[in-house]
A protein has these predicted regions:
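Extramembrane terminal tails and long inter-domain/linker segments of multi-pass membrane proteins
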Residues: 1-17
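Compositionally biased amphipathic helical and low-complexity segments enriched in hydrophobic
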Residues: 5, 124-127
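Hydrophobic cores of alpha-helical transmembrane segments in multi-pass integral membrane proteins
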Residues: 18-45, 55-118, 130-142
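Transmembrane helix-loop junctions at the membrane interface of multipass transporters and ion channels
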Residues: 118-124
Length: 142
């Protein structure tokens, strides 16, 4: 142990693995979502042709994904610091991860398979009045 790594801050292997899973996933999602943002900027600059429906799907996934990904990474950081003061459950931490990933898959399925493109804010009337662009099921999944 050293002053930089006191004994009470070293994670047991299973907890270190869970925290690494969260952080690697957060970084991977941020990279994918940055690519979505870059594609939108390239389309706006006429460097790349992106159909309007795909543009709004990218915008929806980018916005909702950035907010959610920051929440995922933030929960990992909070768990790391809070565990020194409160007894936290590793199974609950992993359950949170699984539920988050399930939500991310549903969001992506609604956006790219169901063609949902109502924007990340999900403001009325877009989710309800899609003008035939996406289904009610896609809006419900989102």
């Amino acid at each position: 142990m050293s002053a930089l790594h006191p004994g009470n801050e070293i994670l047991p292997p299973r907890e270190r693995g869970a925290l690494t899973l969260y952080l690697v996933t957060t970084l991977a999602l941020l990279l994918v979502l940055m690519v979505f943002g870059l594609l939108m900027r390239m389309a706006q600059g006429t460097w790349l042709h992106v159909p309007p429906t795909l543009f709004y799907q990218l915008m929806t996934a980018h916005g909702a994904g950035m907010v959610g990904t920051v929440a995922l990474g933030g929960s990992a950081v909070m768990w790391y610091f809070l565990r020194k003061y409160v007894s936290l459950s590793l199974p609950i931490f992993l359950t949170n991860y699984i539920l988050f990933m399930l939500g991310a898959v549903l969001l992506l399925a609604a956006t790219f398979l169901g063609h949902y493109a109502g924007g990340w804010t999900f403001l009325y009337p877009l989710p309800v009045k899609s003008m035939g662009i996406w289904s009610v099921g896609a809006a419900a999944l989102f």
